[in-house]
């Protein structure tokens, strides 16, 4: 406990900038105290600035209606509502302003980018992805192959962890690229793997793929943006996309973003088109000609949701106020490092899966440079009877006692201390409560 206090003094966060759910608000009793919210990998907490930011746009709507598009009473006119966010978002992902657009939703943006960048020709048709890919991405890849008249099952090449391992090895990804070099049209992987929390070596993956100029490289950064430092331009990725409701704290279904490297600028790439991606000077002249913006903004299709932009604006201001991603990542390394330290000191922790009795291991890499904020815990023993299975019972116990992670069936709980709003004391208390939950189950496993 003393170490937690000392670490908090050394690494102060921005807790006061956020609303954190309480026991009472979650129906867990009448306590007004905040719970230990370790679920920012799924949905980030609401910044206190958000309500005012959104209400300002509601006020503009009520006061000026359509005229707020060009004559806003106190902020950015709606025709340009997303543009002030582009420089901030570019800093978040390590890109130039011309390489980033704030738009759409994650899978919609992924599909839009695949339309532009997945161009199968001759033998070069295959898409390299991971075996544990998030289902929405898998659906996008599968259907892109089908849209091109290809057999998706034969088109998708999936790289998996080795037998007995839980995370991908960079050398295995590189080897898969080399093996299929003559057939690959696209490599598309996560920046941070959603299930295990593994941070992939994106720089090495891009370098390996780009040894063959015909291979396009893209990333789904849903679990990376706002979590780890990114250098998309420097690494040379062709494209990337991300959401904003996890580590960016922009609210459920918040507006997303995409990156298109400057070498693809010029407006010549085929794409899903819409009027918001065309020349702003002539957009409202309703011409029946297509004059796309030359940079990432040319991938926009429709005008963005003003209320979603307002929520993202509030969140990005918190990041800026805190000092940017370098400081966020530094505090995150300390927080998750402390969580890892305490978990591995638990009497129920085992380095390997399958030990006797009740226990858990950590799927996430031990090396801090190979993970973000999230740690994924695998529990045992497993039972097909959900009332007897260890993980759901531990999860329910934790929630009842004010620790909120999330469950991934059948046996994994994900816990994420977020740098902006979680505290070292919360980490300490959460591990204490986890140990207590397992202690309550231990006598049963000994029967």
From Swiss-Prot:
Q: Name one GO biological process term.
A: L-tryptophan catabolic process to kynurenine
Q: Which residues carry this modification: N6-(pyridoxal phosphate)lysine?
A: 246
Does the keyword Cytoplasm feature in the UniProt annotation?
Answer: yes
| GO CC field | cytoplasm
Family membership: Belongs to the kynureninase family.
Q: Which residues bind pyridoxal 5'-phosphate?
A: 106-107, 134-137, 220, 223, 245, 275, 303
Q: Which UniProt keywords apply?
A: Cytoplasm, Hydrolase, Pyridine nucleotide biosynthesis, Pyridoxal phosphate
Coiled-coil blocks: none
Q: Which cofactor does it need?
A: pyridoxal 5'-phosphate
Q: What is its EC number?
A: 3.7.1.3
Catalytic activity reads: L-kynurenine + H2O = anthranilate + L-alanine + H(+); 3-hydroxy-L-kynurenine + H2O = 3-hydroxyanthranilate + L-alanine + H(+)
Localization terms from the record? Cytoplasm
Q: Which PANTHER family match?
A: KYNURENINASE (PTHR14084:SF0)
What name goes with this protein?
Kynureninase
Organism of origin is: Eremothecium gossypii (strain ATCC 10895 / CBS 109.51 / FGSC 9923 / NRRL Y-1056)
Q: What pathway, per the record?
A: Amino-acid degradation; L-kynurenine degradation; L-alanine and anthranilate from L-kynurenine: step 1/1; Cofactor biosynthesis; NAD(+) biosynthesis; quinolinate from L-kynurenine: step 2/3
One short Pfam family name for this protein? KYNU_C
Q: Which GO terms describe its molecular function?
A: kynureninase activity; pyridoxal phosphate binding
For this UniProt entry, what is the primary localization, expressed as one broad class? cytoplasm
What is the purpose of this protein?
Answer: Catalyzes the cleavage of L-kynurenine (L-Kyn) and L-3-hydroxykynurenine (L-3OHKyn) into anthranilic acid (AA) and 3-hydroxyanthranilic acid (3-OHAA), respectively.
Q: Which InterPro entries does the entry mention?
A: Kynureninase, PyrdxlP-dep_Trfase, PyrdxlP-dep_Trfase_major, PyrdxlP-dep_Trfase_small
Subunit record text:
Homodimer.
């Amino acid at each position: 406990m003393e170490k937690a206090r000392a670490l908090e003094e050394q690494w102060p966060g921005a807790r006061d900038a956020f609303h954190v759910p309480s026991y009472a608000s979650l129906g867990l009793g009448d306590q007004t105290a905040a719970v230990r919210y370790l679920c920012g990998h799924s949905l980030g907490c609401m910044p206190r600035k958000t309500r005012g930011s959104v209400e300002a746009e509601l006020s503009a709507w009520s006061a000026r209606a359509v005229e707020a598009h060009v004559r806003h009473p106190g902020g950015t006119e709606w025709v340009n509502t997303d543009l002030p966010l582009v420089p901030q978002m570019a800093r978040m992902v390590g890109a130039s302003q011309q390489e980033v657009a704030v738009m759409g939703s994650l899978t919609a943006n992924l599909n839009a980018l695949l339309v532009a960048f997945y161009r199968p020709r001759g033998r070069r048709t295959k898409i390299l992805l991971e075996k544990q890919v998030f289902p929405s991405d898998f659906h996008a890849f599968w259907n892109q192959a089908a849209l091109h008249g290809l057999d998706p099952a034969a088109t998708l090449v999936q790289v998996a962890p080795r037998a007995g391992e839980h995370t991908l090895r960079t050398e295995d990804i590189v080897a898969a690229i080399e093996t299929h070099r003559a057939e690959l049209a696209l490599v598309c992987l996560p920046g941070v793997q959603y299930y295990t929390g593994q941070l992939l070596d994106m720089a090495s993956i891009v370098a390996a793929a780009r040894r063959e100029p015909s291979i396009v490289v893209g990333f789904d950064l849903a679990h990376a943006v706002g979590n780890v430092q990114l250098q998309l331009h420097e690494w040379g990725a062709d494209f990337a996309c991300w959401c904003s409701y996890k580590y960016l704290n922009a609210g459920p279904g918040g507006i997303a973003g995409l990156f298109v490297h400057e070498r693809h600028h010029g407006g010549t790439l085929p794409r899903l088109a819409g009027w918001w991606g065309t020349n702003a000077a002539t957009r409202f002249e309703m011409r029946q000609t297509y004059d796309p913006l030359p940079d990432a903004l040319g991938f926009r299709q429709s005008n963005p949701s003003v209320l979603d932009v307002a929520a993202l604006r509030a969140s990005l201001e918190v990041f800026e106020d805190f000092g940017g991603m370098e400081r966020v990542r530094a505090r995150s390394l300390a927080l998750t490092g402390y969580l890892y330290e305490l978990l591995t000191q638990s009497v129920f922790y085992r380095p390997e899966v399958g030990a006797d009795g009740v226990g858990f291991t950590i799927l996430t890499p031990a090396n801090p440079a190979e993970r973000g904020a999230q740690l994924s815990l695998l529990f045992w023993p497993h039972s097909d009877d959900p009332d007897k299975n260890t993980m759901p019972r531990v999860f329910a116990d934790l929630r009842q006692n004010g620790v909120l992670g999330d469950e991934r069936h059948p046996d994994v709980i994900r816990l994420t201390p977020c740098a902006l709003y979680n505290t070292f004391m919360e980490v300490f208390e959460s591990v204490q409560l986890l140990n207590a939950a397992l202690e309550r189950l231990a006598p049963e496993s000994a029967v």
